[in-house]
C-alpha cells in the first residue's frame, strides 16, 4: 500500500519538523525519486545483485529468501558483532555471531523462523544497536526495536488490509486521578462515512511497562481489526486503549511529568489512609475506566451504550484490571477476556458476575507463562461455580506473540 497514506492514516503525532533549504530541495527530491524508482522496480534480491558501476552496493537487512533470512550491518571499526532476536530460545541473552564481509559489512544467515512478528537487534562490541536499514520498528515501553515479520497463516492478519480504520488520541479529564489523560481509540473503516451508525466497544488494556500505545505498536490492533472486519470475521467495533498507569497522563514519549507513585506495599502508609483513600490507591484506575472513560466514549463517539455492546480485555496487569472491572461493576460488560492475567477474584465476586449475566468469558494464557498457574486456578474456580467460559491455552510464555494471537481469536467472538 501507499506508505505515505499509511503514515497519515495511522499517526498524526510523530512528525519531524525538518526544514530543507531551497537550493538543496531539488537535489534531495531527485535523489529520493531515483532511490524510490530503483527500490520500486526491484525486490531485495535484485537490488543486492544490481550493478552500481563500481560503487558499493546498498546494505539490505533483513533479507528473506525462501527458507532463510539474512541480517547485515556495516560496522567499519567493530571487532565482534552478534545478532539477538526474540525467536531465539533465550532472547534475553542468546546471541549468534556475525561474520565480517566485504566493505566491513557483517552478515549472518539463519533458517527462517516460524511465521510471527519478531524483534531483534545487533550487539556491537557489547553494545545493543538497532538495524539502521530497517524502518519498521515497535515501541515497547521506552525501547524501539526493529521488526521481522515472517509471512504465513499466523501473521496473515498482522499486515495491512485493503480498508483501514482510523487511530486517534483523544484526551479525557479524570476527576478521580486529578489530570487530563490520553487515550488511543481505533474506529473501524466506514465510521466517518456513516454518521448515524453506532458501534459496540472493546476496552483493551495493556500490561506493566506499557501505555496507551502498546496495543497498537506491539499488538497490531489496528491491522488485526482491519483484516478481521474486512473478511467479515469480526463485527465492526470501536477499540479503546487507555493508559493503565494511574500516575501518568500519557505515554512517557510525550515528555509529560508523572505524579509520584504511591506504593501499594507500604503497609504503614496504607494503614493511615481512609477507606476511600485505600480504594483509590488500589482501584483508582479501574474506577476511572468504568465511571469516566466509558461515559466519555459513549458521549464523544458513536458507541452503543449497553452491556451487550461492551467488552473488556487486558493482558497481564491489564488482565488484572479486566478482572477487577468485571467484579466491581458486574453489570457493565457482557464480554470479559482476561489474558495472562495478573489478578484474581473471590468465589463470591464471580458468583455475582455470573448472576449478572455474561455472554462470553474468555480466559487465555501460555503454558510456560509465569502466570499460568493463576490461569489454571481461575479456570478451576469458574468450573466449580458452573460459570460458562472458554479457556484458551497456547504454547509459549508471557509474550506479545501470544497476546496478538488471543486478540485475533477472541475479537471474532465479540458482539455476536
Per-region residue spans from a language model:
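Boundary at the C-terminal end of the N-terminal hydrophobic targeting segment
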Residues: 42-44
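Non-catalytic cap/lid and distal C-terminal segments of serine-dependent acyl enzymes
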Residues: 46-53, 59-95, 99-416
